[in-house]
């Protein structure tokens, strides 16, 4: 039977969505001999010490049939008519299926996700250490009787030796399965085909179907066959309880919820969630009695009267947010979602497999994509502001006027903070009485001495060995950064492993034979990137999700001149003509021109043409410049004419905008990613809830037990009023069912027999909460006046956005032609010097005139002239890296010129979007190779190094690691429907027309890392003018393409950036890196170079230099050999014979070829244009000056 639902599209139209009425869950039974162990291992989460269980993704064509319905109206109970002899009716609840499936039997053929040993013991220890409850050994209810996997196989007449069983369950009822409130209806078992494989499946229904005369609620004694609640004439079945299944659900479902809700009693979470799932009308508090709180750092008073009021209110806020978040999650899980667009392609049709001919090639393609994804997931573990660590609610202080419950300070009073250092602290109940002593003193006010350990990783993964193994899978594919105090020999993981193995160091989780893969070694390798909690203060929160929308405003000027603000010229003016006159239409014409000229690839935006000569370079730039001038003139004329758009006034309100999808199936292809996205939603929604808590304090006294129940209706109403108010897009949608009756098991017949009955039905929920997306924005134009009155933070932003009043330094290689000059240097100037040496000599005045032909001198003069002109009118702080970026930046600057930006805000750069796009590269780091290296006999440092280097040299097809490259063509990246990670600061403010309406804005912000933002990912920038996100493209991999110890400025990275701007050669930069990193430079990773220099061409030059030094010495790379090679290069004499080119002339038309030292009319004043780099009077630049 089918029933119709209602779904509202983004355009406001309503479309019908058909539901298949059916069971709330299935157990799928299939042969494990037909699965590909390697592919399943790359997709699933499986621990090596739990061979039969795993958490797998919900993927059509892999774990479920291609026609699988993700949204259903599930039968959750029956209800008596109340008349003697009357038939019972069914109760339906709309819901969608969980994005993960749970393998609980027969998973031995699936490869372990990580070879790390002892993850189950680690998770059990961490759970106990941090005070979370463990699965009861006898089951979650009394007298539980297990239904084993062998029993299920026997009932289906399948071989238990070769059968694999896994649970596919509706999202709201995962806890109901855990609480043994369901049963297997073997009589309703059917067959489906998954990728041409015959698979059996057994439907699961709730035991409440046999209890028609009681109110719909959690059944606390489901194994009591003599219960008076069982209906007359019912053949009561055996409830489903499987110990392995419950263990998997405890770690993958319950513990993550307990973590985000700050509730350590996970059995209480299961009971509460089950009760709310069955009772659609419940609006009270279900966790209040079981909630505990971290004890404050200040000593507790002996009596309740002496307890600080602020701490009572903090506990009230923590409890209310958790309760409302739980009921909201259940309500949202009842809303319909489906695979969007091309994302519904079955597994066998994923684009990444289109060129794969063999299973090995398929596994290699899958391994490569997962390595790309590691950059996103890794950020979830490296970021201090990750939702995985937001375990503490902090009170920032009440408003100055207690009576003003809508004061802005009240909206931001409570906020989340990283609580890793408080996990073992003592806990108190709501009254403030200690209930647990914890494992150490509370350090709520200080994180000094904190060290991230394996227990913290297990906590972030819900104490699930499966999810912990999956997390390690991604961390093993993240690069270490040799930047920081521990970058030298002590951080060498190979030595760390060898020393511990030979010394037979005791470890609770590994043995002598498995110590090579121990979790401690992965964390040791990445320890410079692991998070360290900071002093609690309100800041951005890390957000992870997917972009599903076709339309985003992520060009340099965002939603400037949008379609909605354009006037029509008349009735005959088509929508196409109007769109053509928008800023987006302008960007489209620019792109079309570049494609038609053969300069840019239409699908990726990358350069499609090689520069062949100096003349070609000049002609290409002139063509782009002329096109930009013409198109921008037409654009402005249209805006000020027929379109009636006041572009000067609207510039200040323009913003970059896009949306993060809340569809759970956008990220369902990876269990760890689903976990990260689910935690993101929970924390973000609770942040909104916390803003409304202070308004409930006038409903009663927070210290009383009844306060939370009394305040909940007010809080719920206030939270629902925040939907569709700028940040969270969602609404309550009605549930409409059109079927006349439904088919369900006949309760008078044993569940092992095939028998069904027709039931009339009713709905437990008349409407559901459908959340669609988080809206993110970033204002483009910075208002400098706010910086003068906004305190230290705003003043710092003003300093970052500040633009020099006049151009004194022209950075040739960082200017408009820099990327072309670096890429095609040999084609333009010849192979005599590499690009960095050449420009170092030209700018520094050490280039002999005899080495330059008249054509080269003419080209140099042209480059200087256009670079200077660009710099004088440039308001984009980023450097173009492609022809498309160059054209877009030129368009941006031209429009800003028309808008008068130079006159009104000419002293400030604009804010621009960028994306660190994830990619995969072959691993070069021997210490990372340990994770998948076969066990090494006699694991000394030498043997480990030789084995790792041999493995690297062989270039196995699956040993990929994550890397990234930054692009400023953000809208093109958004067009690939990427998985993204970024920081968001949610601002809340009161509406002008209503004092009770709270609007929000999801402001694009950044990550927070232990050693700066680059410890999260090397591609990120700490420059506040550049808003950067992490992005992993789905188009081309999962979705078919459409028709169209310090990272601060005083650190090594800051020093090298200064050298790059000064035009230093790769040898000089390499010398500085060698001084700082020492032996750590031996196995330097690409991501380390990215974090230092950001310039892809310079990175290639540095890696080539590193390889040359290693190849030039008989014993490979050593610190001494590297120093000797650099000294040899540094002693090369600069040519002094003949005249030198003077490239420091201000007059472009006079003295073009004046020799160095010749008399010039250029004044030697402060406003003289000099190029970034050494003075013409200095022949060399000593690296020692960087350490003065």
Swiss-Prot record:
Q: Which GO terms describe its molecular function?
A: single-stranded DNA binding
Tell me which positions the record assigns to the signal sequence: none
Please give the organism: Psittacid herpesvirus 1 (isolate Amazon parrot/-/97-0001/1997) (PsHV-1)
Which protein is depicted?
Answer: Major DNA-binding protein
- Name the job this protein performs: Plays several crucial roles in viral infection. Participates in the opening of the viral DNA origin to initiate replication by interacting with the origin-binding protein. May disrupt loops, hairpins and other secondary structures present on ssDNA to reduce and eliminate pausing of viral DNA polymerase at specific sites during elongation. Promotes viral DNA recombination by performing strand-transfer, characterized by the ability to transfer a DNA strand from a linear duplex to a complementary single-stranded DNA circle. Can also catalyze the renaturation of complementary single strands.
- GO cellular component annotations of the record: host cell nucleus
Superkingdom of source: Viruses
Which cysteine-cysteine pairs are annotated as disulfide bonds in the entry? Answer: none
In this chain, the stretch annotated as Disordered covers 1145-1175
The alphabetized UniProt keywords are:
DNA replication, DNA-binding, Host nucleus
Q: The motif Required for filament formation: which residues? A: 838-839
The reply on keyword DNA-binding is: yes
